Amino acid sequence: MLEDLKRQVLEANLALPKHNLVTLTWGNVSAVDRERGVFVIKPSGVDYSVMTADDMVVVSIETGEVVEGTKKPSSDTPTHRLLYQAFPSIGGIVHTHSRHATIWAQAGQSIPATGTTHADYFYGTIPCTRKMTDAEINGEYEWETGNVIVETFEKQGIDAAQMPGVLVHSHGPFAWGKNAEDAVHNAIVLEEVAYMGIFCRQLAPQLPDMQQTLLDKHYLRKHGAKAYYGQ
């Protein structure tokens, strides 16, 4: 079942250590098949060096039950599941503890849009969620992690299709895209703009956000209705 999707998810997971986005077994990638109502996700705690496509776990979006697979799915599976339910435009999700994005998350800081590298992928400030409550942490923690992400986007009026990433306060980044590969691509860029942002803040603590006109130009030329960037 879903052998092609399993291979795609495996390859996307293997890309995480190659791009220095994970340490040890941290991090996970999933991808969804909406017609079948399932998603494929990395198994929990399996080393990237020995992981195979057969290790990938198929999970129901509706129930959260394992549909296929012999291993336990990632502990972050409920977060992925809720995001697939809440954001129907996304096809793949990545969670990492990449160093510089996690620094922003641990500081409880959103990443402002100060340059065109950021604007090419993220249409504005990359948000950081609020702190989770004790009840949320002690309850269905991973599910509530998804809820706090969705709450942040709803309260701030952010379109998940235009903002393919978020920082969870005191935790780390989640990124998404049209498929697993695209989600990893966005996670790589998220880490890079987080890295740049730290130095920008050191050099110019009062640096304002970039011009809205320039933000619009760079985002919309790649992603807008009249996009013209690329082949």
From Swiss-Prot:
Field pH dependence: Optimum pH is 7.
Residues that bind Zn(2+): 76, 95, 97, 171
Activity regulation comment: Inhibited by glycolohydroxamate at concentration above 0.1 mM.
Binding site for substrate: 27-28, 44-45, 74-75
Phenotypic consequence of residue 97 to N: Mutant shows a strong decrease of the catalytic efficiency and a reduced affinity for Zn(2+). Inhibited by glycolaldehyde phosphate
GO MF terms held by the record: aldehyde-lyase activity; identical protein binding; L-ribulose-phosphate 4-epimerase activity; zinc ion binding
Entry's induction text: Induced by arabinose. Transcription is dependent on the transcription factor AraC, the cAMP receptor protein (CRP) and cAMP. Also induced by L-lyxose.
Protein keywords: Arabinose catabolism, Carbohydrate metabolism, Cobalt, Isomerase, Manganese, Metal-binding, Zinc
Effect caused by changing residue 42 to M: Strong decrease of the affinity for L-ribulose 5-phosphate (LRu5P)
Active site per the UniProt annotation: 120, 229
Keyword field contains Manganese: yes
Enzyme type, top EC level: isomerase
InterPro entries registered for this protein in UniProt: Aldolase_class_II_sugar_metab, Aldolase_II/adducin_N, Aldolase_II/adducin_N_sf, AraD, AraD_entero
Signal sequence range: none
Keyword Isomerase: yes
Cofactor note: Binds 1 zinc ion per subunit. Also able to use cobalt and manganese ions, but less efficiently.
Pathway of action: Carbohydrate degradation; L-arabinose degradation via L-ribulose; D-xylulose 5-phosphate from L-arabinose (bacterial route): step 3/3
Gene3D superfamilies for the chain: Class II aldolase/adducin N-terminal domain
The reaction(s) this protein catalyses: L-ribulose 5-phosphate = D-xylulose 5-phosphate
Family indicated by similarity: Belongs to the aldolase class II family. AraD/FucA subfamily.
PANTHER family xref list: FUCULOSE PHOSPHATE ALDOLASE, L-RIBULOSE-5-PHOSPHATE 4-EPIMERASE ARAD
Protein name per its UniProtKB record: L-ribulose-5-phosphate 4-epimerase AraD
Organism listed in the record: Escherichia coli (strain K12)
Gene symbol of the encoding locus: araD
